Amino acid sequence: MRRPNKAPPAASKDGPRINDDIRNAQIQLIDQTGDNKGTVETVVAIKMAQEAGMDLVEISPNTSPPVCKIMDYGKYKYSAQKKAAEARKRQKTVEIKEIKLRPMIDDHDYDVKMRAMQRFFEEGDKVKITLRYRGREMAHQEIGTKLLDKIKTDVAELAKVEQDARFEGRQVVMVLAPR
């Protein structure tokens, strides 16, 4: 049994409607210099755009009548793509940096880790502190708890605790986020 012939689905276009895609009988027209020409028939507006060597682009389709502008659509589309690319370039993704510690850390090593943490916060990144216990250190978990409390107080003006300290097997994990 044969299937009945179906028309292919209409391709949905991205962006505003231009020229003959505008279906309204009348539109609010803005010319290429930005002057408001008032309510004009769509056919006349398309003719005006073609005489100027430009396109009629629907700016605001939801108003009554829709607002259309005479402009170079290729140039408009190109500048919109450039703006979007620039916005993507400027957008910073927040990374989670990890700092690994041991409960019996020396003072100088602690200072080095704190400087690294401070640099991460200045860059706008979150910091995941992993405190790993080895061997008999598990019997003295209060040392690790004191160390994490000391870290919290030392970075209090730079960061806030996003996820409080919690055990994951033989390690304690805490996440700090910049203020």
Swiss-Prot record:
Q: Which GO terms describe its biological process?
A: ribosome disassembly
Top-level lineage group: Bacteria
Any one GO CC term of this protein is: cytosol
Extract one GO molecular function annotation from the record. Answer: ribosome binding
> Can the keyword Cytoplasm be found in this entry's annotation?
yes
Q: What's in the keyword line of the UniProt record?
A: Cytoplasm, Initiation factor, Protein biosynthesis
Tell me yes or no: is Nuclease among this UniProt entry's keywords: no
**Compartments it resides in:** Cytoplasm
Give the family, as the similarity comment puts it.
Belongs to the IF-3 family.
**Subunit structure, as described in the record:** Monomer.
Q: Which HAMAP family match?
A: IF_3 (MF_00080)
Q: Which PANTHER family does the UniProt entry name for this protein?
A: TRANSLATION INITIATION FACTOR IF-3, TRANSLATION INITIATION FACTOR IF-3, MITOCHONDRIAL
Q: What does this protein do?
A: IF-3 binds to the 30S ribosomal subunit and shifts the equilibrium between 70S ribosomes and their 50S and 30S subunits in favor of the free subunits, thus enhancing the availability of 30S subunits on which protein synthesis initiation begins.
Name this polypeptide is given:
Translation initiation factor IF-3
**The organism of origin for this protein:** Bradyrhizobium diazoefficiens (strain JCM 10833 / BCRC 13528 / IAM 13628 / NBRC 14792 / USDA 110)
Per the record, the gene is infC
